[in-house]
């Protein structure tokens, strides 16, 4: 996948998740956190002219934090929002994880 295509696809999937999420928000703290994560990540993607590691790190931060909110937090998604999240989850594992470059000490087990 080309750099610009990856940014475009990520923006499209996150915009879709954001749009669907608007219908199931309950105003709880985790809902607000997810909305802030979506807003900041979408802003960074819109500013991005080319794909670099900082964009990939932003996507990874969004992914990790949202996974925690969905898995361990009090965030409740309806079926449509959960499907939109699973679509982004699949995209993230197929196109972001293997391109992300880690620096510093990394321990593999």
Predicted regions span which residues?
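A sequence-composition feature that detects small, non-aromatic residues
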Residues: 10, 29, 48, 81-84
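Generic hydrophobic segment detector
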Residues: 12, 52-61, 81-82, 103-108
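Intrinsic-disorder-associated interaction segments
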Residues: 3-6, 10, 48, 52-55, ...
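Short terminal alpha-helical segments
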Residues: 1-39, 96-109
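Amphipathic alpha-helical interaction modules
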Residues: 24-72
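Amphipathic alpha-helical binding modules
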Residues: 66-109
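Residues that form generic nucleotide/phosphate-binding pockets
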Residues: 16, 20, 62, 84-87
